[in-house]
Amino acid sequence: MIRLLLAAAITAMSVLPAGAVWWLENDYSFGSNGLNRNSLTFFTIPARNLTAGLNAAFYKDSGVYDHKTFSFRVPMMYSGPRYSVSFKPFLYPVDGDTRSGAYGGKLFLLTSMSEEPDESYLRLSVSGAWARQKARVLAAGVLAPAKKSFTQSSAELQAEKSFYGQFYFLASAAAFSKPDGVSNATLVTPAMDQADLAYMGVFRQITALPDWIMTAQIARNMKPEYDSYIYAGYSKISYRRADKANSFTGGIKLNLNEKSNLDMAYNAYKEDSSSWKSYYKLLLQLFF
């Protein structure tokens, strides 16, 4: 199983170097509109089949999010022989610049439908997420004096197929609830990245309210010639009463040595009424 395909980190235990009991993961993205996004996660194994982590992240750009918006997560994961379960609570403290914040959590279940000796398999996953946001809103075109609190939820289904441990295919779909009393036209700088609710396939933050998302991904294992994977993906995002968006990703994951991996990727993103935007990602894993 390659971690670049699944959004959850619960499969990390299956690829840990021998003797590794904790590791660091730094995920950095940059690109159009001055995007600067960084996420640092510490993982450890406190008990057999159990992984726990601490994450701190921020994003900023040269637009309305021109100050760093911080967030924190505590991923907890159990991995068994036929299924894995992950729960990840998250928090966006109310920011002094955006005056927005959020908290919530995501529950993820992965199960194996078939496992073959030649490394072929079929795995299905289902996840649900919930969030409570607080943000400024417009009322009759004027900024309202009080912030608005609202609730979001999502449901996501993924299927991943491996052929001989060489080719991997993944398809996923997610649907989002309709929040009461707010819309993309009235929300002002909401803080929460929607990637905390479902896999988006985008390297930048997505704070607009989605309606649904569909994604497809493919990856190729380059072993034994090269100790790496190459991958590509596509996402279609439908925003609630707003333009739809298309997102393409492509990259390579390199095993630098027994103690480190490097993932380098490119993302092209376009909303229907906008021009193409380019984003780049560097993800480094260090095992100890």
Name each model-derived stretch.
Residues 19-69, 131-135:
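Short glycine/proline- and aromatic-enriched beta-strand/turn motifs that initiate or cap beta-hairpins
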Residues 34-40, 66-72, 99-105, 147-155, ...:
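Residues that define the transmembrane beta-barrel architecture of outer-membrane proteins
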Residues 117-237:
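Detector for outer-membrane/organellar transmembrane beta-barrel domains
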Residues 44-46, 74-80, 107-115, 159-165, ...:
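Residue-level signature of outer-membrane beta-barrel architecture
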Residues 254, 266, 275-288:
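Outer-membrane beta-barrel "beta-signal"
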Residues 27-33, 55-61, 88-94, 125-133, ...:
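Outer-membrane beta-barrel pore domains and translocons
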Residues 35, 61-67, 85, 96-101, ...:
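Outer-membrane beta-barrel proteins
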Residues 22-24, 48-54, 80-87, 114-126, ...:
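Repeated loop/turn-to-beta-strand initiation elements of outer-membrane beta-barrel proteins
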